[in-house]
From Swiss-Prot:
It is found in: Cytoplasm; Nucleus, Nuclear pore complex; Nucleus membrane. Residues 311-467 form the Helicase C-terminal domain. Associates with the nuclear pore complex. Coiled coil: none annotated. One of its GO terms (biological process) is tRNA export from nucleus. Residues 1-51 are annotated as: Disordered. It catalyses: ATP + H2O = ADP + phosphate + H(+). SMART domains: DEXDc (SM00487), HELICc (SM00490). A motif (DEAD box) lies at residues 230-233. GO terms for cellular component: cellular bud tip; cytoplasmic stress granule; nuclear membrane; nuclear pore cytoplasmic filaments. It comes from Neosartorya fischeri (strain ATCC 1020 / DSM 3700 / CBS 544.65 / FGSC A1164 / JCM 1740 / NRRL 181 / WB 181). This is ATP-dependent RNA helicase dbp5. It comes from the Eukaryota. The Q motif is unique to and characteristic of the DEAD box family of RNA helicases and controls ATP binding and hydrolysis.
Length: 489
């Protein structure tokens, strides 16, 4: 059975991975009964959600230009055809994966082929990309001896501690029947604790911590076979994270298989990724198919910054219908809103990067369990976190790019896409509300509408009964109509 190396102290109540219970093998069938309303994917009790299978075409570009990407060798319709270890197949079956998703159909043969080749994959959240790279990592590790079981062979990097913990949970569930599998976490620890030596076959972590552990020789990387970057665009585009990723890669074996996955790949990041993972096979969705279906996009006019806060308080009753995330631009804003709303008797929590790791873990776990309904966050949560109960996202501050050389304020389209993607997950219905309090914010909202060729509906805050009616109807609807179409290059 798979085990997790206790590299970090888990908070009471458990991390996602800690809360995953292994099924009783005596009652476990090889093919579990299909879950209602679920096509593929890990059920909620195993830390997963339904897969979202939108209508899209998967485009494949092979590094070998003489090869035919439409050859059946580069596609698969069932997991059994991949020649997987039966114990991995059993893990997939217990996660309720009955057949590969569209992305997995094309990605898995390329990932698992020998000799290993690099892969750059662009696929929106909820399409099975995490399961694809985890399955590849499980298939690549050698667990034939006790020494190899304690030797890092696959490294998965994520931009945030929260996403790393989520991926670690997927590895543990998928590998739960693999004897000798040990999983380690290389994520920031509380200030008073020191990371222990990693003795595991698969490591999930963040770039900064991994780099530090390699320098301290608590992580020996010389036997690594696979390097995965999830949300790769975010890591390669951010100066700090990008530099850390480059430094980590420079310390790894030169023949390592590099796998990059992300929901978005702006052109300049794609060029960077091509250098980070040279001669890679590429899998992409057509740009116009980068959709977030089922999200009703609204905006509210606010007189000024103070009116923004009053509007948020006015919305509080609606925020707790399901779970909600309020996105702000700065840590100071998150802390100030939390302080004021708590003083007024509202139950909210904030999640920002400077909090101690154990506190961040506890907050995320409370939010997943529904004990905390309203979360105030900076962009630390905009990437990849799957919480199926989120029904509303508030853009208290419209996301913007800081480009001193460009006149005026510029909306950050990719962050907007990732933010509103926290709701309406896996085909569910959700609401996104943006606050607009001045002309510059109005211009940024228009930039978003133009880029994504979508209409964001104005709601008149003078009539709060109407506001409540619109939002409640949207959340209760089985389907939301507006399409969030892909934007321009």
């Amino acid at each position: 059975m798979a085990s997790e190396q206790p590299v970090e102290a888990a908070p009471t109540g458990g991390s996602l991975a800690d809360r995953i219970t292994k099924p009783d093998e005596s009652n476990t069938s090889e093919t579990p009964a299909p879950a209602a309303d679920q096509t593929d994917g890990a059920p909620a009790q195993l830390g997963g959600s339904d897969l979202h299978e939108p209508e899209y075409n998967v485009e494949v570009k092979l590094s070998d230009l003489q090869a035919d990407p439409n050859n059946p060798l580069y596609s698969v319709k069932n997991f059994e055809d991949l020649g997987l270890d039966p114990r991995i197949l059993k893990g997939l079956s217990n996660m309720n994966f009955r057949k590969p998703s569209k992305i997995q159909e094309r990605a898995l043969p390329l990932l698992l082929n020998n000799p290993p080749k690099n892969l750059v994959g662009q696929s929106q959240s909820g399409t099975g990309k995490t399961a694809a790279f985890v399955l590849n990592a499980l298939s690549r590790v050698d667990l034939s001896t006790e020494q190899m079981q304690k030797t890092p062979q696959a490294l998965i990097l994520a931009p945030t501690r929260e996403l790393a913990r989520q991926i670690l949970g997927v590895v543990q569930v998928m590998g739960q029947f693999v004897d000798g599998l040990i999983i380690g976490a290389a994520v920031p620890t509380d200030r008073d604790s020191r990371p222990k030596r990693l003795e595991c076959s698969i490591v999930v972590g963040t770039p900064g911590t991994v780099g530090d552990m390699i320098k301290r020789r608590t992580f020996i990387p010389n036997k690594l076979k696979v390097l995965v970057l999830d949300e790769a665009d975010n890591m390669l585009d951010q100066q700090g994270l990008g530099d850390q990723c480059i430094r980590v890669k420079a310390l790894l074996p030169r023949d390592i298989q590099v796998v990059l996955f992300s929901a978005t790949f702006p052109e300049h990041v794609h060029q960077y990724a091509s250098k980070f993972a040279p001669n890679a096979n590429e899998i992409t969705l057509q740009h116009e198919e980068l959709t977030v279906e089922g999200i009703k996009q609204l905006y509210l006019d606010c007189a000024d910054g103070e009116d923004k806060y009053k509007t948020l308080v006015q919305l509080y009753g609606l925020l707790t219908v399901g779970s909600s995330i309020i996105f702000v631009q700065t840590r100071a804003a998150a802390q100030e809103i939390e302080k004021r709303m708590t003083a007024e008797g509202h139950t909210v929590v904030s999640l920002t990067g400077e909090r101690d790791p154990s506190v961040r873990d506890a907050i995320i776990d409370q939010f997943r369990r529904g004990e905390a309904k309203v979360l105030i966050a900076t962009n630390v949560l905009a990437r990849g976190i799957d919480v199926s109960t989120v029904s509303m996202v508030i853009n208290y501050d419209i996301p913007e790019l800081h480009q001193p050389s460009v006149p005026g304020r510029q909306a950050d389209f990719q962050t907007y896409l990732h933010r509103i993607g926290r709701t309406g997950r896996f085909g569910r219905v959700g609401v996104s509300i943006s606050f607009v309090s001045n002309r510059e914010e109005w211009e940024m909202l228009n930039q978003i509408q133009t880029y994504f060729n979508c209409e964001i509906q104005r709601v008149d805050t003078k009539d709060w009964d109407e506001v409540e009616d619109i939002i409640k109807k949207t959340i209760k609807n089985s389907r939301a109509n507006p399409k969030f179409a892909g934007g321009k290059e």
